[in-house]
């Protein structure tokens, strides 16, 4: 079988929507948003959250991709809730696209899941812990879907050039690099804003994950902690530096969420946060 031809990364990744204009993700484009709850808890929860985010995105005039995870395979504890699973989630992802018009994103942990997930979502995300797994990157790239790669907490930003090359080397130019903090001692992450312009030099859109950047990995013993009060601060800083997209996990009741509650933004606060980020984005990109 012929090997795929290596390509350069696209400066702008277009994510088609079921009913409207595509979401254009590019470092020089208007800010776009990836948002949704950490994990898919139920059909009702997923649809209600997606509808709320769609309404806010329409009011703000911002391109939004709905994200949620069918399986949180890297939870701190083996006893932690992981999500509803691949089989039960596929129809829900498709329903979200059909009834809201939002494109969708989810993360994969297994090479065998990539082609299955690609039938139901628009963007495949590679978790930070798995960002150097060549077989997973190639399997995801081979689906033809856009790929969002979380930079590992253990990687320097310039090391993402080799990670991105695994996707483009498989013939897929639609790839994004996502900053989500770097390990800074035990149970702590820090966001180095120098990473954003460094990763831009790769030539792909750069995403800033504002919620996992405030995570405290394993900080609660059997689960991760977080400091959601710093999400707006870090998000504003990233947008002031200049990014293509901001990733924000949001939940109607984060304090009672099954995972990542301490760093998720309440849905009721989401619209004001994004409205403020759009003002920063307009100033940054007008300069």
From Swiss-Prot:
Does Transcription count among this protein's keywords?
no
Gene3D superfamilies in alphabetical order: Aldolase class I (3.20.20.70)
Q: In which pathway does it act?
A: Carbohydrate biosynthesis; 3-deoxy-D-manno-octulosonate biosynthesis; 3-deoxy-D-manno-octulosonate from D-ribulose 5-phosphate: step 2/3; Bacterial outer membrane biogenesis; lipopolysaccharide biosynthesis
Name of protein:
2-dehydro-3-deoxyphosphooctonate aldolase
Origin, by domain of life? Bacteria
A molecular function GO annotation: 3-deoxy-8-phosphooctulonate synthase activity
Q: Which keywords does this Swiss-Prot/TrEMBL entry list?
A: Cytoplasm, Lipopolysaccharide biosynthesis, Transferase
- Where is it localised? Cytoplasm
List, alphabetically, the InterPro entries matched.
Aldolase_TIM, DAHP1/KDSA, KDO8P_synthase
Give the source species. Answer: Caulobacter vibrioides (strain NA1000 / CB15N)
EC class: transferase
Which processes are annotated in GO (biological process)?
keto-3-deoxy-D-manno-octulosonic acid biosynthetic process
Instruction: Cite the PANTHER family for this sequence.
Output: PHOSPHO-2-DEHYDRO-3-DEOXYHEPTONATE ALDOLASE
In short, the EC number is: 2.5.1.55
Family of this protein:
Belongs to the KdsA family.
């Amino acid at each position: 079988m012929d090997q795929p031809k290596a390509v350069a990364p696209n400066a702008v990744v277009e994510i088609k929507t079921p009913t409207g204009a595509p979401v254009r993700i590019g470092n020089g484009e208007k800010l776009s948003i990836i948002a949704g709850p950490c994990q898919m808890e139920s059909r009702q929860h997923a649809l209600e959250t997606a509808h709320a985010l769609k309404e806010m995105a329409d009011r703000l005039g911002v391109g939004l991709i709905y994200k949620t995870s069918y399986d949180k395979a890297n939870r701190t504890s083996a006893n932690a809730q992981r999500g509803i699973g691949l089989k039960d989630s596929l129809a829900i992802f498709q329903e979200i696209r059909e009834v809201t018009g939002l494109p969708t994103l989810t993360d994969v942990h297994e090479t065998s899941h990539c082609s299955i997930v690609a039938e139901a979502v628009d963007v495949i995300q590679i978790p930070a812990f798995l960002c150097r797994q060549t077989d997973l990157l190639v399997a995801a790239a081979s689906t033809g879907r856009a790929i969002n790669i979380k930079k590992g907490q253990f990687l320097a930003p310039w090391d993402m050039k080799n990670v991105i090359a695994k996707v483009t080397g498989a013939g897929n130019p639609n790839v994004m690099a996502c900053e989500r903090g770097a390990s800074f001692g035990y149970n702590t992450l820090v966001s180095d804003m120098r990473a954003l312009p460094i990763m831009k030099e790769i030539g792909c859109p750069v995403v800033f994950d504002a919620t996992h950047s405030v995570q405290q990995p394993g900080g609660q013993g059997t689960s991760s902690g977080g400091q959601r009060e710093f999400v707006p601060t870090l998000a504003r800083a990233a947008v002031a530096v200049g990014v293509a997209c901001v990733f924000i996990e949001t939940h109607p009741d984060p304090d009672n969420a099954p995972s990542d509650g301490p760093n998720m933004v309440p849905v009721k606060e989401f619209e004001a946060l994004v409205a403020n980020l759009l003002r920063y984005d307009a100033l940054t990109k007008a300069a």
